């Protein structure tokens, strides 16, 4: 649970210090962005946007000719969801530890079982299944995923609220223990969303004026979760005025509010490696082969034609329709189809081997 500090005399150096650390971490992250973009382009094109800002409604599958990778990602994410955190099933439990005697364990077991079912009920009534599935997609494609575990508002069906932070919005750092416990997240929120999320914040007059003109305008926020001993400091910084960033929220968590995890970790690397990264050469090869097959098929259907330059046949006036009469000069071969050099069976053999 977040304990907010209401001291109006917050340290004015905090935004600059947090931004400095964020920029250093983001600079290290940029080494991954080209690889991530390539993985998402072929396996999860509706996400992505690491090296460019995608527009709403933008076509993102222009260079995808083979959907095998996209189908495989969806199937693996569904398998992880069904095997690790199945919906409406008891996928975790509580049991007595080894320090208790058998009599004490028997006495406390029913209490722990009841507590586990209560927690499971809150998971089932929350949006956990939807958000963890999005994390599995990021994990499979990008190798790293982050899940925000927050407290829901009073009166909601569940005490828990979850949100999957896309890899495009998250910058991570490892702590002393090797865990991904330092998290920077960039958000774009409307004034209504800002007031709902940061209830105690005092907003600049310039921001209020802009929001009055356009209530749907989104404002940039940087959230940071930084470990501090056994606790976690939380900061939210308004990023609109780059010359004077403002600290709009500050508090501490007893436990980490963000769960970040990796598929495979390589030595010396912060972010994880994914199955899509391993299969990327085969994915690109299959995509290129299917592209060439489609081009070859279009040529096979429509054909490529050649004609002698005999001064009679004008290619601009020729229509290849039933009943057409095509003029040609005496002794000329006229319009003739060009033999196809490609072989479809070779392309299929390549795909089968992949």
Task: Enumerate the language-model features and the residues they cover.
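Short, flexible beta-strand-to-coil junctions
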Residues: 140-141, 148-155, 224-231, 237-243
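Extended, helix-rich architectural segments
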Residues: 1-215
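Extended, charged amphipathic alpha-helical segments
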Residues: 233-354
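Generic structural hydrophobic/aromatic packing signal, biased to beta-strands
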Residues: 119, 147, 170, 221, ...
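Globular "head" domains of long coiled-coil molecular machines
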Residues: 211-215, 219-231
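A generic short-segment signal for beta-strand/edge and adjacent turn/coil regions
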Residues: 112-118, 129-130, 191, 203-208, ...
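Generic structural motif
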Residues: 157-159, 219-221, 234
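Primarily cytosolic, helix-rich juxtamembrane/linker segments of multi-pass membrane proteins
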Residues: 175-176, 208-211, 227-228, 246-248, ...
